[in-house]
Design a protein with these regions (language model features):
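Eukaryotic acidic, serine/proline-rich intrinsically disordered low-complexity regions
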Residues: 1-24
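Alpha-helical segment of the N-proximal tetratricopeptide repeat
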Residues: 30-32, 36
């Protein structure tokens, strides 16, 4: 679930070239600038740098609309992929030094979306991730993976609340099935492992030690997406 790709960074290696060209003109205030490779910027300048509100269009169709500071995307802004993409994906939110940083929303081409915290271009902190198939996770993330406390809801009605590590069920948690079954206990890498209690839908229960037990009554309680 990492979202920071090279092109998403608006590679102002390219921008370094762009900035040199702009600075030669020493543009100031509102204006526009066309680059030799077909890129185009329209907005505010300060001492020869993109600074303030502006719109930057790349030759491939990508577009950024928002705030700039000293030639870099900084503040609030929206970035969309190129027109050649089968479906558009975009990021809307806060930026720092050309990276997603702070609060934001990222929507993928397949309709999956994440809303929450970003850090230096990665999903990091707290947020909600919704998959295109209807699954949803709300909770803590680290380096783009489910990590910490969170809740995962499957489209089939199953749900888990508890601890995650490296994208999987790890630690103490509660898993519930639509049929009324429930497990409260320890998990290791997505499977029941350690001390716990399992209730059948008829109310009968088992308490004790579970050893690499995956699923109950044909159901799987493993998170398949990181």
């Amino acid at each position: 679930m990492k979202v920071q790709e090279e092109k998403d960074a608006i590679l102002l290696q390219e921008s370094g070239i762009y900035q040199e060209e702009i600075q030669e003109q020493m543009l100031q205030g509102q204006g526009s600038f066309d680059f030799p490779d077909g890129a185009h910027y329209e907005g505010e300048f300060d001492q020869g740098q993109m600074h303030g509100q502006g719109t930057f269009n790349w030759p491939g169709g990508e577009q950024y609309v928002g705030e700039f500071r000293n030639g870099k995307r900084q503040g609030q802004g929206r970035y969309l992929t190129g027109a050649e993409a089968e479906e558009v994906e975009y990021y809307q939110g806060e930026w720092n030094q050309d990276r997603y940083h702070g609060k934001g929303i990222f929507v993928w081409k397949d309709g999956s979306r994440y809303e929450g915290d970003f850090d230096e271009g990665n999903i990091e902190g707290r947020g909600t991730y919704q998959w295109s198939n209807g699954d949803q996770y709300s909770g803590e993330f680290r380096d783009g993976h489910k990590h910490g406390q969170g809740s995962y809801h499957w489209e089939n009605g199953e749900r888990y609340s508890g601890e995650f590590a490296n994208g999987d069920l790890n630690g103490q948690g509660t898993y519930q099935w639509p049929s009324g079954q429930q497990y409260i206990g320890e998990y290791l890498n997505g499977i029941k492992h350690g001390q716990g209690t399992y209730w059948e839908s008829d109310g009968s229960q088992y308490s004790g030690t579970f050893n690499n037990l995956k699923g109950n009554s044909g159901n799987s309680d493993r998170v398949s997406r990181s």
